[in-house]
A protein has these predicted regions:
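Alpha-helical lid/collar subdomain of P-loop NTPases
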Residues: 1-141
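Charge-biased C-terminal accessory regions appended to nucleic-acid-, cytoskeletal NTPase
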Residues: 86-286
Length: 286
């Protein structure tokens, strides 16, 4: 499968999950031609769906873990416990990604709004529908640039998603401009600024959803695993995942920083003990 094929397949799986649907082996075979790999991937997905539903991952990330979950974990094998940790990380990563995309879209729309303000300043107030017409032309140029970059292969998956989101928002703003029939450029800009506030609120909501889920995940991890190997894996993966690292760096998470610090100290302590043991062996052999 090509890189583009994997991207399309990943997008499809994300869409299925958002709709509450499950991808079966027949669907997987449309993207993965190798029979054994398709079977293995299908088996992995089945296990993923099973643990996700059995443990109620979304409930855990909402801070509403069922008591039965903790009872089941007491007798669960290590690989099953790690699978649950992986599912929690996947759910968090989806929220971190959504927050990052909402942030990127808001930033891009803000930059577009500033350009529109500069353009409006050059328009005489007596031109009928002038702001809406200019805004439409700016939108057309933005869409054309997106198409050009996409065809040239210059856009990453995230960059393309952001530009498509921005264009969808701009179309809504243009519709509001035409509906309001703003009499002047200042009135038109004030309307757009009000529209931007809704987008800013959407960004704040995505950030809050991710932060809340992260806190709920730590609550669950502490109650279910304390400072065991599962917690080590959880914190380590948060450190290694780009979306998680970026979100935590920007928004903070005291418990993450504390656990990460403790893990670093434990690592240094273990390394020192190994050095001391090696030194003792060298002296013992003299």
């Amino acid at each position: 499968m090509t890189a583009r094929g994997w991207e399309d397949f990943s997008n499809l799986l994300d869409t299925y999950e958002a709709l509450g649907l499950k991808a079966d082996e027949a669907l997987i075979r449309q993207y993965i031609q190798h029979e054994k790999i398709a079977e293995d991937f299908s088996a992995y997905l089945d296990l993923y769906y099973k643990y996700r539903d059995d443990y109620g991952v979304e409930e855990i990330l909402a801070g509403q873990a069922r008591p039965a979950v903790f009872a089941r974990l007491l007798n669960a094998p290590f690989d099953e416990r790690l699978s649950l940790v992986s599912l929690l990380l996947s759910g968090l990563n989806n929220r971190f990604t959504a927050s990052r995309r909402a942030d990127a879209a808001a930033d891009a729309c803000y930059a577009f709004l500033r350009e529109a303000k500069q353009g409006f300043a050059t328009l005489p107030d007596d031109i009928p529908d002038g702001p809406a017409t200019l805004f439409n032309q700016m939108m057309t140029d933005y869409d054309a640039e997106t198409r050009r970059q996409r065809e040239a292969g210059l856009l990453s998956r995230d960059a393309l998603a952001t530009r498509l989101k921005v264009y969808a928002v701009l179309r809504q703003w243009e519709a509001e401009l035409r509906r309001a029939k703003a009499a002047g450029t200042q009135e038109a800009f004030d309307l757009l600024r009000t529209q931007f506030q809704s987008l800013s609120d959407e960004r704040d909501a995505a950030q809050e959803a991710a932060a809340s889920a992260l806190e709920a995940a730590f609550d669950f991890m502490e109650q279910a695993f304390a400072e065991s190997q599962e917690m080590v894996v959880f914190v380590t993966e948060l450190t290694l995942a780009p979306a998680a690292h970026a979100f935590i760096t920007e928004n903070g998470c005291p418990r993450y920083f504390q656990y990460n610090k403790d893990l670093l100290l434990d690592h240094r302590k273990a390394a020192l003990q190994q050095e001391l043991a090696a030194e003792e062996r060298r002296h013992g052999g003299m």
